[in-house]
């Protein structure tokens, strides 16, 4: 799934760029079997890289939170535009503060509906569709409040 998202982003950027514009896209596969491995990989981007990326697109919650912390730790807030994934309290706070520009969130209500539909289909037919396409939402500073739970508003 991550590769599909990566290739969609790459295709869109290549189609939308101006003729005289150069866009270099790099994909990094992070071993996220432990939070420490993820933190080390993100640290290497900020410490060992010759140049920081202009935009960093995170494909999961752990990487998004690690990048957020690295931006602060290495004094790079405002130097890298970050598109995160999911909406934990940490990520929502980062968006509210303008440290992360936006995050992609799956429509959890739709996931729930599709799950129930799949269970009902499996119960009655003995099988179900192997793929359900779920909607995505973009969380920005303008709409971050709608993603906060009652206690965290």
Give a label for each model feature.
Residues 56-57, 102-104:
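Paired acidic/hydrophobic, glycine-rich loop segments that form the ligand-binding mouth/hinge
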Residues 3-11, 36-39, 87-91, 106-124:
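Hydrophobic alpha-helical segments within soluble ligand-binding/sensing domains
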Residues 98-100:
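Glycine-enriched alpha-helix->loop->beta-strand junction motifs that scaffold or abut catalytic
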Residues 8-9, 24-26, 30-92:
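Hydrophobic alpha-helical
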Residues 1-4, 61:
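Extracytoplasmic "Venus flytrap"
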Residues 11-20:
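Short helix-loop-beta junction
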Residues 107-153:
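Hinge/cleft segment of the Venus flytrap/periplasmic-binding protein
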Residues 95:
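Glycine-rich loop/hinge motif
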